[in-house]
Regions:
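Short carbohydrate-recognition loop motifs
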Residues: 482
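Bacterial N-terminal signal peptides
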Residues: 14-27
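N-terminal secretory signal peptides that target proteins for export/translocation
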Residues: 1-9
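Gly/Ser/Thr/Pro-rich low-complexity, intrinsically disordered segments
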Residues: 26-479
Length: 482
């Protein structure tokens, strides 16, 4: 699948398009009512400048549809949030929204039990995890002019200044590496995703903050090699990055060629210039106006509560939820129906996010939809937020070459210290654990996605990465691996 780049109109043109779409929708609703169809009941309200909430009742389902229309040219910013800012972590969408000062939010991507996102996830340029690198994702650029839908081009390298060693890092904050892989681990993984035992490892400590790479195509950060060893004991991260490969692996000699005290340049890219945040999902529903939603035998494709993100032509961003599993109130949508719903809203691009009992929309301090779990709002791995202004966590664009070797005084910065593992980490709550189990069994959420993958309904099994195949196998065996 090709990557889709959607360019957003700015200024008066975008505003005019936005108002025109709203006017046409009102006229269309009036025409249906006048003709006696009475299928749709539509209510609209202004949330904040550039953010509008539309509530739709479709009597044909019936279905209750909630749509946030976000026009970034009028101040709001689309942002992502990782639950509790750690891996794995579970948190309610409402909690993440309140912590980040959002005006509105929907739940984010699929999560494994415990809360690790199923997909490549990045926040403010910081790569959190790389699982499911063949999957699809949504990414806004920092200047709010482009939006990416499609397959991210994950790439991480470590280049030694003295030895000349160039290491390709295959996974990031996942499980143990395969024999032909080098894995990277940061303190974002806390105690649940740690460097492996029986590995050759190198610990890199930061000597600078992250900065844009050339043409803003990814990021770079100057590090220094603190230690290199092969051992049956796991290497501590100490606020830095640990690169590891099996002691018996094919890449062990290459990793051992790094020299203690050697400057190393870490570079990482999502394949989308200017993108700071990446939120994974599956599958894409619309591509450049083409409906690519499909039907399959898996329950994942059947009627479920749904959450998705789309782009309204070349104008506003759409965050959409559909309630489900409530006969007589809202039954939910199949993937094909969800794609058609985005078409009716005027979208040209759309991506399916975590659904089922995870489906949640939060606006101005309250959940405004009806989550399908008996306990109400589910704990989830991530959220897609609407901020009222600029994202305070985004890095300023820096010129390429600002991290030349030797320009830093070294040592650990305040940011690095903040990443240190807490000596008494917060344990998961009972509700959080139960939410993870519910997601694992939910046909509209993670369990349904992985069952569809394993059955070949979402992606041919031959194209699965080794890491994702392990995840699918673990779900089939009833094992929840960290």
């Amino acid at each position: 699948m090709r990557t889709i780049v959607a360019k957003r109109m700015t200024g008066k043109v975008a505003l005019a398009a936005f108002l025109t779409i709203c006017t046409l929708a009102v006229q269309a609703a009036g025409q249906m009512s006048a003709s006696g169809a009475d299928r749709f009941t539509i209510r609209r309200s202004q949330v904040s400048p550039g953010v509008r909430l539309t509530r739709i009742i479709d009597s044909r389902g019936p279905n209750r549809i909630s749509v946030l229309t976000v026009d970034p040219s009028r101040a709001p910013t689309i942002d992502v949030a990782l639950a509790r800012n750690k891996l794995p972590g579970n948190q309610r969408t409402s909690g993440m929204a309140a912590e980040h000062g959002a005006v509105a939010a929907v739940n984010g991507t699929f999560g494994l039990p415990g809360g690790r996102p199923v997909g490549l996830f990045a926040e403010d340029g910081d790569l959190k995890t790389s699982s499911l690198t063949w999957g699809r994702a949504f990414a806004p650029t920092h200047d709010k002019t482009n939006y990416f839908f499609g397959h991210p081009g994950f790439s991480v390298t470590a280049t030694g200044d003295t030895s000349g060693t160039i290491l390709r890092v295959h996974t990031w904050n996942e499980g143990p590496p395969a024999k032909d892989e080098i894995a990277g681990y940061t303190t974002a993984g806390r105690r649940m995703i740690q460097p492996p035992t029986d590995a050759c490892s190198a610990r890199l400590l930061p000597r600078s903050k992250q900065a844009w790479a050339e043409n803003q195509d990814g990021f770079e950060r100057q590090m220094i090699v603190d230690r290199v060893r092969c051992s049956d004991q796991r290497m501590k991260r100490l606020g830095g990055i640990v690169l590891a490969t099996p002691t018996w692996g094919l890449l062990a000699p290459k990793l051992r060629s790094l020299l203690q005290g050697e400057p190393v340049m870490m570079r990482w890219s999502f394949g989308w210039p200017g993108a700071l945040d990446v939120l994974p999902g599956n599958p894409t529903l619309l591509e450049g106006g083409d409906n690519v939603g499909y039907s399959c035998a898996s329950p994942f494709c059947g009627r479920n509560p749904r959450t998705g993100v789309g782009l309204d032509g070349e104008g506003p961003v759409l965050l959409v939820t559909v309630d489900g599993r409530r006969p007589g109130y809202s039954v939910g949508m199949t993937l094909a129906e969800f794609a058609r719903q985005f078409e009716r809203l005027g979208a040209s691009w759309a991506l399916n996010l975590d659904g089922g009992g995870s489906t949640t929309m939060w606006v101005e301090g309250r959940v405004i939809n009806r989550p399908s779990d008996p306990a109400g709002e589910r704990y989830v791995s991530s959220a897609l937020l609407v901020l009222g202004g600029q994202d305070p966590g985004e890095v300023e664009p820096l010129s390429y070459g600002s991290l030349a070797f030797g320009t830093s005084t070294g040592g650990r910065t305040s940011t690095d210290s903040a990443l240190a593992v807490s000596s008494s980490p917060e344990g998961p709550s009972l509700q959080s654990v139960l939410s993870g189990e519910l997601a694992a069994d939910d046909p509209g959420s993670t369990g349904g996605l992985l069952d569809a993958i394993d059955g070949g309904d979402v992606e041919p099994a031959a194209r699965l990465s080794p890491a994702l195949q392990r995840i699918a196998d673990d779900f089939e065996d009833g094992v929840a691996r960290p």
